[in-house]
Design a protein with these regions (language model features):
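Conserved RecA-like P-loop NTPase ATPase core
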Residues: 24, 58, 71, 101, ...
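Conserved AAA+/SF3 P-loop NTPase catalytic/coupling segment centered on the Walker-B
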Residues: 53-76, 107-116
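Conserved nucleotide-state-sensing and coupling region of NTP-binding domains
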Residues: 6, 61-62, 91-92
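Structural motif
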Residues: 8, 54-56, 101-102
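Phosphate-sensing "switch" segment of ASCE/P-loop ATPases
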Residues: 93-98, 107, 112-151
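Conserved catalytic/switch belt of AAA+ P-loop NTPases
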Residues: 29, 68-92, 123
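AAA+/SF3 P-loop NTPase mechanochemical coupling elements
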Residues: 45-50, 84-102
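P-loop NTPase catalytic core of nucleic-acid-dependent motor ATPases
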Residues: 1-51
Length: 151
């Protein structure tokens, strides 16, 4: 799929945004999957989006402008072109193959091409908290069963 939606979990602290998206990743890719964050310069984001099939970027309450640009490239399916190191005129191309999910308490995605591709889920704060390690164990124990329903 060339263009991709961007799944976004929005809610207050303690609403399970990160836990929910982490579980999706663990169902798809196993127990070692985890969410990530991006630095203000977003230098490592291109590496993430060209080497993974699913990336969860956590706590995007004040995303840098460069992140909005990167999200637009992801959503529209652009190819990332770079000059090959130590060469003058050789170019490398990297396909953006991942789907991106975001978490935010107060989303600030103002670019219309990004906002149009967001699939937002709004979560409320839990009244009763459950231990995330136990939730992970339950999901991992039932992973095969969960995946069999998706096929």
């Amino acid at each position: 799929m060339k263009t991709k939606p961007i799944f976004t979990a929005i809610g207050s602290k303690g609403s399970g945004k990160t836990t929910f998206l982490r579980r999706i990743g663990q169902i798809l890719f196993g127990k070692k999957f985890d969410v990530t964050s991006v630095a203000n310069d977003c230098k490592d984001l291109e590496t993430l989006i060209t080497n993974n099939y699913y990336v969860v970027i956590d706590n995007l309450d004040n995303p840098p402008k460069t992140l909005n640009d990167a999200l637009a490239r992801i959503a529209t399916g652009q190819i990332i072109k770079k000059r090959k190191l130590f060469t003058t005129n050789q170019e490398l191309e990297f396909e953006v193959k991942c789907y991106v999910a975001l978490t935010s308490r107060t989303p600030q995605f103002t670019r219309d091409d990004v906002a149009d591709r967001l699939i937002c889920i709004y979560l409320e704060r839990f009244g009763l908290f459950k231990d995330e390690n136990n939730l992970c164990k339950v999901v991992m124990d039932k992973r095969d069963e969960i995946l069999s329903y998706t096929i």
